[in-house]
Curated annotation (Swiss-Prot):
Name this protein carries in UniProt: Acetylglutamate kinase
Biological role: Catalyzes the ATP-dependent phosphorylation of N-acetyl-L-glutamate.
UniProt-annotated location(s): Cytoplasm
GO biological process: arginine biosynthetic process via ornithine; L-arginine biosynthetic process
A single GO cellular-component term on record: cytoplasm
Alphabetical keyword list: Amino-acid biosynthesis, Arginine biosynthesis, ATP-binding, Cytoplasm, Kinase, Nucleotide-binding, Transferase
Site feature Transition state stabilizer, where: K29, K238
Reaction(s) catalysed by this chain's protein: N-acetyl-L-glutamate + ATP = N-acetyl-L-glutamyl 5-phosphate + ADP
GO molecular function, one term: acetylglutamate kinase activity
Keyword Protease in annotation: no
Coiled coil stretches, renumbered: none
NCBIfam families: argB (TIGR00761)
Length: 279
């Protein structure tokens, strides 16, 4: 009997959060181990399907860096990185577009199998993501200039769940590879999303990444600004994205461990949460 009561308590605990976030837009940046491990991938898809079915409005932005690197190697296309960003010449950009499109359609298929009206897009569709060249040394790597969010608003209104590949275009219709974190942040700002969640390969934000007991469960925007200069590497970039989002209309940003099964549900629908809440 006790185990049944525990299950009931879990549902009751989720109720106020389901009510609070009903009809709210939730941006999810999907990447890392949660994309590479089939069991974790299925858990993420289940979480997102449940978010949708209880009345939230999720949007997924996905990456695909490791798959792009693997395909470049398989096809003999040279792939190099500068300052953590892939140098994207025309050949590399074509490979990236192909791989990201394949990932995108697989995600659409996975969610449709769970009863969700999912639709796959890239930033070129409907001129969703207009960009310019980020750096001449990076070739076709883009910086987003404008998000034409009307198409996403119309899809959400028609009960679709958009899944977006991080590919954009410039005014001359050239194709650009864009950092998926940047895409998620830009779209969240354009739609003034209730939440932006990053699925990562870390438990969250730490005061000291060498001290696993220093995990920060919640941090205000002002505290995040103070902490940001003290953090190095990829998490510094991610924290800057969190700050940018919170300063531009996104209410809360979450840094979650995508290696933990059902981390999205644990963060959004429980009192304690999991990972780090910014804002």
């Amino acid at each position: 009997m006790q185990k049944y009561l525990e299950k009931a308590n879990v549902l009751i605990e989720a109720l106020p959060y389901i009510r609070k976030f009903n009809s709210k837009i939730i941006l999810i940046k999907y990447g890392g181990s949660a994309m590479e491990n089939e069991e974790l991938k299925h858990c993420v898809m289940q979480d997102i399907a449940l978010l949708k079915l209880v009345g939230l409005k999720p949007i997924i932005v996905h990456g695909g860096g490791k798959d792009i690197s693997a395909m470049c190697e398989k096809l003999g296309v040279k792939s190099e990185f500068k300052n953590g960003l892939r140098v994207s010449d025309k050949a590399t950009t074509e490979v990236a577009s192909m791989v990201l499109n394949h990932i995108n359609k697989n995600l659409v298929h996975s969610l449709q199998n769970l009863g969700v009206k999912a639709i796959g897009l890239c930033g070129k569709d409907g001129a969703l993501l207009e960009c310019v060249k980020k750096d001449e040394n990076l070739a076709f790597v883009g910086t987003i200039q404008k998000v034409n969010s009307k198409i996403l608003e119309e899809l959400l209104e028609k009960d679709f769940l958009p899944i977006i590949a991080p590919i954009g275009m410039d005014e001359n219709f050239n194709t650009y590879n864009i950092n998926a974190d940047d895409v998620a942040c830009a779209i969240a700002k354009a739609l003034r999303a209730e939440k932006l969640a990053f699925l990562t390969d870390t438990a969250g934000l730490y005061e000291d990444f060498n001290d696993k007991n220093s995990l920060i469960s919640k941090i205000s925007l002002e505290q995040a600004k103070i902490l940001a200069p003290k953090i190095e590497g990829g998490m510094h970039v991610k924290l800057k994205s969190c700050i940018d989002a919170c300063e531009n209309g996104v209410k809360k940003v979450h840094i979650l461990d995508g290696r933990v099964k059902h981390s999205l549900l644990l963060e959004f629908f429980t009192d304690e949460g999991i990972g780090t809440l910014v804002g």
